[in-house]
Regions:
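Conserved ABC ATPase signature
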Residues: 146-151, 155
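A short, surface-exposed alpha-helical micro-motif characterized by mixed small hydrophobic
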Residues: 214-216
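The feature captures the beta-strand-to-loop junction immediately N-terminal to the Walker
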Residues: 36-38
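Conserved ABC transporter NBD signature motif
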Residues: 59-71
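A short, proline-enriched helix->beta-strand linker immediately N-terminal to the Walker B motif
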Residues: 166-170
Length: 265
């Protein structure tokens, strides 16, 4: 099986200042990679370099990003438009970064569909309903007829996830998708992401500073420190037997709770 995403010797930043350097990794179809590290380590910059989402652009100085056999960094405008949103979707930390507060939720789903496909209203409604059902969202009409600010934070984030998987993307880039949520809703969202991986074979890169989230969700973990990957491997191996001094210090800072559970500091 060929990798879905290959990043090779990637260095990127802003205004001539390098933030991430010499990043190399691969992501297989259906695999979840957790990227952990302290604030300022370059986690979000890595996603921005891959995403090409409007407003998230960063400057790539060296390296290549290959997605599904295509050179992601040198696609023309039409290829990028097709790829972003349909084959690669982005889940932001805060739902407000994804949802327009002046438009009802239903309209935003319609706009996403029509940006990539020609569909009648009935077909769109059926597609939306099927996605809501897949991730366990009930009371569909109430949600679709609401404005984003009328939804709770947890519900809004679940709507964002539904919007992200609407067109069955091959890759989801998630930037701290649960950090703004309470613990109960966090687990619910994580379970929904795992279910999407299992049912749709969607690959994901999940940025988090919460080791518990990485342990629960990721197949593999990459540890970022000062813009570079210092350790990467299977989640259990990296988190239970860290080799790099920074990874060891990161794990030592995680409070241990009863029953072997871990909680974000």
């Amino acid at each position: 099986m060929q990798p879905l995403l290959t990043i090779q010797d990637l260095s990127a930043g802003y205004g001539g200042k390098t933030v991430i350097r010499d990043i190399s990794l691969t992501l297989m179809p259906g695999e979840i990679l957790g990227v952990v590290g302290e604030s300022g380590s370059g986690k979000t910059t890595l996603l921005k370099a891959v995403s090409e989402v409007k407003g998230l652009r960063t400057d790539v100085y060296t390296g290549t990003v290959t997605f599904d056999g295509e050179d992601l960094l040198h696609m023309d405008a039409e290829e990028k438009r097709k790829c972003q949103g349909e084959e690669i979707a982005y889940v932001f930390q805060h739902p407000g970064d994804s949802l327009n507060p002046t438009r009802k939720v239903r309209v935003q789903f319609y706009e996403t569909i029509l940006a990539h496909r020609r569909m009648e209203k009935k077909e769109m409604d059926e597609l939306i309903a099927s996605v809501f059902k897949r991730i366990g969202l009930t009371d569909v009409e109430r949600i679709l007829n609401a404005y984003p600010f009328e939804l709770s934070g947890g519900m809004a984030q679940r709507v964002v996830i539904a919007l992200a998987v609407l067109l069955h993307p091959k890759l989801i880039l998630a930037d701290e998708p649960t950090s703004a949520l309470d613990t109960t809703v966090q687990k619910q969202v994580l379970e929904e992401l795992l279910m999407l991986r299992d049912t749709l074979h969607t690959a994901m890169i999940v940025i988090t500073h919460n080791i518990g989230v990485a342990r629960y969700l990721a197949d593999r973990v990459a540890v970022l420190y000062k813009g570079g990957i210092v350790e990467m491997g299977k989640t259990k191996e990296v988190l239970e037997n860290p080799q790099h001094p920074y990874t060891k210090s990161l794990m030592a800072a995680v409070p241990k709770l009863a029953y072997g559970m871990e909680k974000e500091a």
